[in-house]
Amino acid sequence: MEKLAHNYHALRGLTPYGTKFMGLVKADGYGHGAVPMAKKLEELGADYLGVASLDEAIELREAGLKLPILILGCTPALYAGELVQYNITQACYDLEYAKALSAQVQKGGGELCIHIQCDTGMTRLGFLCQEDCQDRSAREILEAVKLPGLKAEGIFTHFAQSDTSEEATMVQFDRFLAIIEKVKALGYTFSLRHCANSAATLLYPATYLDMVRPGIVLYGHLPDVSMDPGLCDLQPVLELKSRVGTVRQVPAGAQVSYGGTFTLARDSRLAVLPVGYGDGYRRAFSNQLSVLFDGQKAPILGRVCMDMCMVDVTDIPEVEEGSVAILYGSDGKGEQSVEMAASLPPATISYELLVTITKRIPRVYL
């Protein structure tokens, strides 16, 4: 937990005094465990939490979290009553949805806090904010925020290329500022304007506005491997480890695992680890990735199974049943980073490797 605290303070140090901080804990806290991460962020002084769905938000409320929670994804208007009941803020992405939310809230009573979502170039959700759409969208946003039962606290957008293109990001940012000004000219001012995701928090201070929304960087990973690690002193929060189930002597010529994709060229000692793609350890790692034993690399041989994988410890004689293998992380003598694993073909991103670690793997918080 001290690494999460370290990253939080490092990111807070980038923002001016008074800038609010939304910590994203969607996808089970990027695989780290949403409730423990959220509780730590609340303790550290975060102002808001961000999730993707109603179920994620309710999980936090039922765990005792008091911070404001914004659902960034779609929640059917039918569940407006639950949004009000649990005091959850909902992203509102078009006028028809706003009207549906308003109608449902009026049936059940109360008031629903919303943040207006603007599509400035992500092409996913939001009022269209390209230059030829802005006047119409400003009028629709004004109509939405005046609907009964809705309290329009904030307005936000999401950058599509903030980790790779400053030009594209500034186009989106300019569109966002323009729509805010157009709505203001029509008579409505938002108290929270936010657009800075992880990459923008590191790269573009101009985009901080009233609140930043760090996600992957909170957990110690850069949004893109090409980014300069010197932008912020981040520490990976998670290490993935497994203990050796057994060690077997296997003769030369034996084929290892499903499909016989690896044939032993020598008599070998194979350590069996009780972790596989059923735990989120990718099948694509087969015959490509290594694990660490006290700084020494033991390559995965053969295909990663659903529940197990085999690694070659012939040259690491001290490995025995119960020895600890580091799958992602560092032991001070060597490192097996999530980014390194993600770069193996077919390449993916650190986000995917983290969020696909399944519930079968227990989380231990230190």
Residue ranges of each PLM-predicted region?
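Active-site-proximal beta-alpha core segment in soluble small-molecule metabolic enzymes
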Residues: 1-6, 13, 17-194, 208
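Active-site anion/phosphate-binding pocket segments in diverse small-molecule metabolic enzymes
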Residues: 1, 5, 13, 56, ...
